[in-house]
Amino acid sequence: MQAADPTADATAKFLAGLPVNGTPLENYSSATGWKTHAADLDRAWKQFDERQLAKIREWAPQALGPAYQDNGPMYYMFSGPDFLYANAFFPNASTYILCGTEPVGPIPDITKMSQHVLPSALANLRKSLDSVLSWSFFITKNMKVDLRQQQLSGTLPLLYVFLARAGCTIDSVELVALDKTGAFVPAGKGTTPGVKIVFTGPAARPQTLYYFTTDLADWAINVNPNFGKFCEQQGQGVTLLKAASYLMHSDNFSKVRGYLLAHSKVILQDDSGIPYRFFTNDKWDLRFYGKYLGPINRFLKNKQPDLEKDRAASSSPPLPFSFGYQWQPSRSSLMIATPK
């Protein structure tokens, strides 16, 4: 087993507002700015855990069955840095594959930051966590601004926070890149930048988290097939799709849609993922939870009359947590699709 990287792990705990006693960052945690950060995050996290994560942890083993125990790869396209929900639904995955258009950013180093800017950098970090803790998803437009701050920029600080708060210990962090064949090349050499984080979770075995900066539109994949080639080498996995902007409802995203339909042992999604019409009865077993109310106002053009009709004809078990764009549990719904 790989030894923990004390610097990366301490940085993750520091950014997550968790104790760093006995680490090189202990002195930094005596600053008022960090104490405020830790108290604010503790409070927000407690509410978030009670409202969302604790309920998912209770619901997922029974609802997902064998997929919950699956220790293969886990695909979460259009995820941004949302390791939180990936890990809550599928805690046993060997490899988490996340992606988004947001940059990875540099590896955070608290010791190189001026003590004058640290309080504002931590406040900005809390601000970028606001939407996922309040509404269960990142707002892409806001993230572009939040993640551009000069200190603690990119998705890595958020991934650190989520890993630390999920009770994981970071073993190693490496900036990577992919070439046209989907193979790893040194960071800066390939056209698809990413990060590879090896961590040990509560299950006490090494797991790997990848996050890649990439565009999943068909035209972008034609120009830059790197990420798709990498995924093909991972094989069959479990898939999560949540607050995916209904992008795969457009034929401009047919390649990623086709990949997930062909390579998923299970797909857990809200209605913003793959359109209902692709899950035909002869090929898929479908189970529904919650109440389907259609898209929120911003995405009304993506209504699915076939889904609405079929959902109205049968009742579904309630969903104890919110999921996707409908941020109240009583208005949320999800679908679990398993290939026959």
Name each model-derived stretch.
Residues 130-153, 157, 161-258, 262:
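Mature extracytoplasmic/lumenal regions of exported proteins
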